[in-house]
Amino acid sequence: MSSYANHQALAGLTLGKSTDYRDTYDASLLQGVPRSLNRDPLGLKADNLPFHGTDIWTLYELSWLNAKGLPQVAVGHVELDYTSVNLIESKSFKLYLNSFNQTRFNNWDEVRQTLERDLSTCAQGKISVALYRLDELEGQPIGHFNGTCIDDQDITIDNYEFTTDYLENATCGEKVVEETLVSHLLKSNCLITHQPDWGSIQIQYRGRQIDREKLLRYLVSFRHHNEFHEQCVERIFNDLLRFCQPEKLSVYARYTRRGGLDINPWRSNSDFVPSTTRLVRQ
């Protein structure tokens, strides 16, 4: 269990509780979780973070009524800056989006502006929102993470409790390499409900070579770990930076959707540009 799982800041969340579904607009449904909850135990300070990045959300179940009452549907793309005070709790996000269902808006841009305003207020940070008509995305190919997949190793694993022990002495040699490693075996659990979260992760770095077996064992150790998606990515970035000390590092995870939403956080200390094309499990 994470050290802050019972923090009072989490007590008021609707997550893990029975809730009513409202279908008329209600911005108060949105709930934020302070990023400091997981950053403080990691020694990360808001004014001196070792990374930049965003939390990329895809909204697959977004619908509202136009001015004449005709339902509209869209796919939304949201990017929340890493400097925001709060991350956005996903169940509250789903409930908030449901409140658009029977609400009339004059045009698409009004919907976009409403989302941008409310999400920014909840997160207390910079956010961007784009809405796409379905025909704009038809034929969009399934993407993949560029890099070398480390999953097909002939190793025995019998411990699934989170530990950084695998990263100790996990670099080999003095030669500086630049490579991108990928795993589809990332599985963690919701901080509150402990429901499984399934993801693929891309790790791009420049530095002494990281032992792939030790890295895979470390990633698999998240299997019983309870944290939100964004928190897991920041923990992985911080652990790799601390133990492996790469000159450059980027960590990007794309998680499978739940409740019509997928969350795809990335953190980097270089000029990393994430691909936003959905992966095969998304």
UniProtKB/Swiss-Prot annotation:
InterPro entries, sorted: GTP-CH-I_C/QueF, NADPH_dep_7-cyano-7-deazaG_red, QueF, QueF_N, QueF_type2
Task of the protein: Catalyzes the NADPH-dependent reduction of 7-cyano-7-deazaguanine (preQ0) to 7-aminomethyl-7-deazaguanine (preQ1).
Catalytic activities: 7-aminomethyl-7-carbaguanine + 2 NADP(+) = 7-cyano-7-deazaguanine + 2 NADPH + 3 H(+)
Gene name in the database record: queF
Catalytic residues (UniProt): C190, D197
Binding site for substrate: I88, E89, S90, H229, E230
GO terms of biological process kind: queuosine biosynthetic process; tRNA modification
Keywords for the protein's UniProt record, in alphabetical order: Cytoplasm, NADP, Oxidoreductase, Queuosine biosynthesis
Family: Belongs to the GTP cyclohydrolase I family. QueF type 2 subfamily.
Gene3D superfamilies hit by this protein: 3.30.1130.10
Subunit structure: Homodimer.
EC numbers for this chain: 1.7.1.13
Pfam name, any one: QueF_N
Location within or outside the cell: Cytoplasm
Official protein name in the record: NADPH-dependent 7-cyano-7-deazaguanine reductase
Pathway connected to this protein: tRNA modification; tRNA-queuosine biosynthesis
MF terms in GO: preQ1 synthase activity
GO terms for cellular component: cytoplasm
Binding site for NADPH: S90, K91, R258, G259
Iron-sulfur as UniProt keyword: no
